[in-house]
């Protein structure tokens, strides 16, 4: 004899867009400006200006499930990811091929003091990081994280 068990299964469906749009090669950019200070305090949320150019032949969408956003990774001195999923910074509007955009990146600093590499990257949400499609498309800068001055 067996016991009948009832449970609910849920699923979410997200429309990502038309196949042609999803296949568009948006994964090309040029970092034009924005450099963090060489030292930051641990466990902080900081803002930093950045400028990027869309060097692809497709428009970067600023909205929708597969929007393009700027982000970052924190790496250790050996280049291994310590924090891979950095905060996203939304584009203020769609960026046409050849267009540039200036925005404020929001960056959460690591909790643990030490020497890190801050790697700036971009991603197309739900699909891919630019660095996964175009290795070498990131900018890496050394940053020392000092102990927090919180009491």
Stretches found by the model and what they are:
Residues 106-114:
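Short, surface-exposed loop/turn segments at beta-strand-coil junctions that are enriched for proline
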Residues 90-101:
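Short proline/glycine- and polar residue-rich coil/turn motifs
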Residues 30-31, 73-91:
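Short beta-strand and strand-turn-strand segments in soluble, beta-rich domains
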Residues 50, 116-127:
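Internal, hydrophobic beta-strand segments that form the core of beta-sheet-rich folds
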Residues 10-41:
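Low-complexity, acidic Ser/Thr/Pro/Gly-rich terminal tails and inter-domain linkers that flank the onset
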